[in-house]
UniProtKB/Swiss-Prot annotation:
One of its GO terms (biological process) is pentose-phosphate shunt, non-oxidative branch. Catalyzes the reversible conversion of ribose-5-phosphate to ribulose 5-phosphate. Pathway: Carbohydrate degradation; pentose phosphate pathway; D-ribose 5-phosphate from D-ribulose 5-phosphate (non-oxidative stage): step 1/1. GO terms for molecular function: ribose-5-phosphate isomerase activity. Substrate binds at T28, G29, S30, T31, D81, G82, A83, D84, K94, G95, G96, G97, K121. Its EC number is 5.3.1.6. Belongs to the ribose 5-phosphate isomerase family. Pfam families: Rib_5-P_isom_A. It is an enzyme of class 5 (isomerase). It catalyses: aldehydo-D-ribose 5-phosphate = D-ribulose 5-phosphate. This is Ribose-5-phosphate isomerase A. One of its GO terms (cellular component) is cytosol.
Length: 218
């Protein structure tokens, strides 16, 4: 089974968490694209979706799924999204696709976070994947210096502007042994919009695409 086939297995398995008549929180990325395709097969059974990115919104609309604004929804039953890394405590690094802030907002209003990944994303310690930080442009240099003080090696993600009009710093060479503490420290830096650590709001369910098919941990 290829990596993409494992992603597809995880994405389609997430359909079991979608309630009839509900509005579904939808994340961003290659694994989520498979979930969106799966969602298209039951579009008449759901009310619609709240999307975490422009890219996902476009894909949902192409399939005829109504997309609601986050401000118009009080809560969501389920949010389905991928991760760049996930540890045994279901804490994650997200934001490889630069949608981390909107992903965090949609996760915050959701009762259940279903994380869909292939089996290359599971790690013992977070940090091998560069940690994305969304930053207001005028604060880029200051935030980079502060991230160095925390032991990281930040790199400006050239040519990327987030859906919110901000920039991304990717922090390399971090071993994040206490993700909740690191999330708080980075979020406390002036000019940081948010960091791609999902530790305080981790996953409730993890669906992993493996060569044998989808493995579900609740």
């Amino acid at each position: 089974m290829t990596q993409d086939e494992m992603k597809k297995a995880a994405g389609w398995a997430a359909l079991k968490y979608v309630e009839k008549g509900s509005i579904v929180g939808v994340g961003t990325g290659s694994t989520v694209n498979h979930f969106i395709d799966a969602l298209g097969t039951i579009k008449d059974d759901i009310k619609g979706a709240v999307s975490s990115s422009v890219a996902s919104t476009e894909r949902l609309k192409e399939l005829g799924i109504e997309v609601f604004e986050c401000n118009d929804v009080i809560k969501l039953d389920v949010y389905v999204d991928g991760a760049d890394e996930i540890n045994h405590a279901r804490e994650m690094i997200k934001g490889g696709g630069a949608a981390l802030t909107r992903e965090k907002i949609v996760a915050a209003i959701s009762e259940k976070f279903v994380c869909i990944v292939d089996d290359t994303k599971a790690v013992d310690v977070l940090g091998q994947f560069p940690l994305p930080v969304e930053v207001i442009p005028m604060a880029r240099s200051y935030v980079a210096r502060e991230l160095v003080k925390l032991g990281g090696d930040p790199a400006y993600r050239e040519g990327v502007v987030t859906d919110n009009g901000n920039i991304i710093l990717d922090v390399h060479n971090m071993q994040i042994t206490n993700p909740k503490e690191m999330e708080d420290k980075i979020n406390g830096i002036a000019g940081v919009v948010t960091v791609g650590l999902f530790a305080h709001r981790g996953a409730d369910v993890v669906i992993t695409g493996t060569p044998e098919g989808a493995k579900i941990e609740e």
